[in-house]
Amino acid sequence: MTELFAVMRTRGAAWNDTVPMEQQVDWRAHADFMNALHAEGVARLAGPLAGTRDVLLVFRAGSTAEVEARLAEDCWSVKGLLQTLWIKPWGLRLGTLPGDLGP
């Protein structure tokens, strides 16, 4: 059985603050990786939080360990561009996610 997880990631030490996100090292590989997770139904929502160095993601997975393992495969994790601050189970109480039938 799967559940939803809220994930907070932040820019790591390898992030280059002088260039936009789309010009970071291995941007295309990172974007392709995240798009593949979305196509699988694992990464449900994702995006940067305005005015911060953080990114909020909503994942559907079987456990926190599964979320950690999947994010560890991202080249931006491996190369230190992003690091995970926390992963917490999330109970959606209002609205629905597209294509989601619930818990």
Question: For each predicted feature, which ranges?
Answer:
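Conserved, structured core segments of small domains
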Residues: 1-103
